Amino acid sequence: MMRGGMGNMQKMLKQMQKMQKEMQKAQEELAEKTVEGTAGGGMVTVVANGHKQILEVKIKEEVVDPDDIEMLQDLILAATNDALKKVDELANDMMGQFTKGLNIPGLF
């Protein structure tokens, strides 16, 4: 009976190692993906990667008004938040297969 238990344990460990490798690969793929967040009808665009690093900020010239810097700041903030929300959605889609059935707050 002990022997069967050890075999099951080894099988479970192998499955966990396989899952760990697959998760690592998915995280590497996630880092290579990019998303765009926009605000003001595309007047401000923020590009982020899957690790929530901002890679680029694009601002259309016509939105730059020296007399209304606050509006530009709001658009940049909104576009950044939109990009980060999309990264979260992408991470949930990609990593969700590994966390299905697990209810761990803050994990993807």
From Swiss-Prot:
Region described as Disordered: 1-32
Keyword Cytoplasm set for record: yes
InterPro entries, per database record: YbaB-like_sf (IPR036894), YbaB/EbfC (IPR004401)
Disulfide bonds: none
Residues in the signal sequence: none
Compositional bias per record (Basic and acidic residues), positions renumbered to this chain: 19-32
Molecular functions (GO terms): DNA binding
SUPFAM superfamilies in the record: YbaB-like (SSF82607)
HAMAP family: DNA_YbaB_EbfC
The protein's role, per its UniProt record: Binds to DNA and alters its conformation. May be involved in regulation of gene expression, nucleoid organization and DNA protection.
Subunit structure: Homodimer.
Family: Belongs to the YbaB/EbfC family.
Protein name: Nucleoid-associated protein GTNG_0017
Organism name: Geobacillus thermodenitrificans (strain NG80-2)
